[in-house]
Structure formats: C-alpha cells, structure tokens
C-alpha cells in the first residue's frame, strides 16, 4: 500500500516511543512529535494598562515581562480550528511555511508588495 507521507505524520525518526501531550481543545492524548505546536507571545499587561504602569513605575525604562505559551493541538482540532489546512497531494511535499498575511487598516498586505511600494 502506498504511503501518504514520508514522515507518517510525525517527527519521531528512530525514537521508538514519545511521551504524549494533551490537546488544548479536546484534551486528547497526542504523541508530542505528532501534535501541532504553536507558540504565543503576549504582554502580561494589556495594552490599556501599559501607560498607567509605566507612569507608576520607579524605573525609567522597565521592560514589561511577556507570557510565553506553547499550545499543543491534535490533528483533528488543528484542522477544525484552521490552524493547519488540508493540502493537495503535490502541496503536501512543500515544507516551507506559507507566506504570512499582514493586515494594515483592513487590507491584506504581502511583504513583497510592501517592499515594492517602499522602493
């Protein structure tokens, strides 16, 4: 039978067994190498309170701490939440990440178009 993916949908490669992690959405046990991982970096303080904190702070240039959160999803939840998308058989072989869409005043702007306009 033909294989759908060279990696079998995981990143194990000769390890035998990998400890499971729990999906953020449905709490399903997923092998750590198979889980879809995303990292969110946010300020601990919301944008509305940043100015109040900087004015009340004793230190002139105090860098506010950030929250680093690693999110693990099972494959079905990641597809359902559109974190990853189903791709065609030829597109599955493309390993480079897709172009990030940047939003400026409710318009989609690609980095290439922004570079052309700047020059």
UniProtKB/Swiss-Prot annotation:
This is Small ribosomal subunit protein eS26. It comes from the Eukaryota. Component of the ribosome, a large ribonucleoprotein complex responsible for the synthesis of proteins in the cell. The small ribosomal subunit (SSU) binds messenger RNAs (mRNAs) and translates the encoded message by selecting cognate aminoacyl-transfer RNA (tRNA) molecules. The large subunit (LSU) contains the ribosomal catalytic site termed the peptidyl transferase center (PTC), which catalyzes the formation of peptide bonds, thereby polymerizing the amino acids delivered by tRNAs into a polypeptide chain. One of its GO terms (cellular component) is cytosolic small ribosomal subunit. GO terms for biological process: translation. The keyword Transferase does not apply. It is found in: Cytoplasm. One of its GO terms (molecular function) is mRNA binding. Pfam families: Ribosomal_S26e (PF01283). It comes from Candida albicans (strain SC5314 / ATCC MYA-2876).
């Amino acid at each position: 039978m033909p294989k759908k993916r060279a990696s079998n949908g995981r990143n194990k490669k000769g390890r035998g067994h990998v400890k499971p992690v729990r999906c953020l959405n449905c709490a399903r046990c997923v092998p750590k190498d198979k889980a879809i991982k995303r990292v969110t970096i946010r300020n601990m303080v919301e944008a509305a309170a940043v100015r109040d904190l900087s004015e009340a702070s004793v230190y002139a240039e105090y860098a506010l701490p950030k929250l680093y959160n690693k999110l693990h999803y099972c494959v079905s939840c990641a597809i359902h939440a559109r974190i990853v998308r189903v791709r065609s058989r030829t597109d599955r072989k493309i390993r480079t990440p897709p172009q990030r869409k940047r939003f400026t005043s409710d318009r989609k702007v690609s980095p290439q178009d922004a570079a052309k306009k700047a020059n």
